Amino acid sequence: MKRSRILCLVLVLCLLLAGCGNAAKNSENAEQENQTVQSQMETDDTAGENESAADAQEAVKDNTEDGQVIHTAGADVSLSDLSYQTSDNNAPVVFFTSDISSEGLIAIYQALDWKPTGKVAVKVSTGESERSNYLRGDLIADLVQSLDGTIVECMTAYGGNRAEIAKAKQAAEDHGFTAFADFDLLDEEGEIEIPFDGGARINRAIVGSHIDDYDYYLILSHFKGHSMAGLGGGIKNVAIGMSSRSGKVYVHSAGTRTTGNIMHNNQDAWLEALPETVKAVSDYLGEGRMVYISVMNRLSVDCDCDGNPAEPDMHDIGILASFDPVALDQACVDFVYAAPDGGSLIQRMESRNGIHAIEHGEEIGLGSRSYRLEIIDE
């Protein structure tokens, strides 16, 4: 009996010890499971935090890109305010610098990586009077000389100081152009007609006969307003600036005549004749033979053909350059709209429907209104 009790006690003790062992093991397993779950939760939390951080960084990146501030020569503007600017790599590039100086002009020319060979003509407006806002020699001389370029121009069709050979040459001298470069009136010895069948308004461009004396053309323009076209940039500098006197009348009349005054009775029609003339000239010269730079300073509502222009009431912006004249003019327009003080020039452009020349330029394949802005400033 005593032995039986002892055996029972031993059995109970063994059972108790086994239970404690299983409990300890279960407790250990539970602890391991808890640690695994906790670790997984921490991992998930970390992943979520990292994902949220990445999303936040991407959002900041997107906001930075959309709201990138462009430092112009005057007031800053937002990249997102340039209506036709795009990130599409297939869009034509428009280069920009806020440095309106001889050095800035050379820098933006170099950004184009244009490699002209042979004779280079530089098409500028030589200005109607000393009060006109034409590009001054201290700004453009170094670039023109680096190209061994010849300043070219045509006579005007509205009278004034450049309506005759002697007067036009005298104006170029008086305004300082002959001090740093040769000067050539493209229509001094007459004109030639360039056939064109890709437009709605004209069937030819009538330009100065010296056009064939040059292998490449740098279209160096002063962007501003215009009393008839609303705005003047690269398109107008070619369409009117390279046309002979009768060619100018032909453009202004939207292809209806070559004599008489330059007044017109169909605003949109004559605006369409502008890019059509540029397309005719560009096709005639060949791809890559023309490049465009526009300087956005002294932004008057009036053209450089005006001898007594209105004083600018907005800040300077910068210098822009492109192989595409439509993209370049559109970018200049976008900068005016983005500027906080562009109201007067905007009113001038809109009152003449000046944007229509750019619209039609895209329609006929002269270029693209959409562009990719590349800022060359450091």
Over which residues does each language-model region extend?
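Serine/proline-rich low-complexity intrinsically disordered segments, especially terminal tails, linkers
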Residues: 6, 29, 41, 54, ...
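C-terminal motif of bacterial Sec signal peptides marking the signal peptidase cleavage site
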Residues: 17-19
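Bacterial N-terminal signal peptides that target proteins for export
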Residues: 1-7
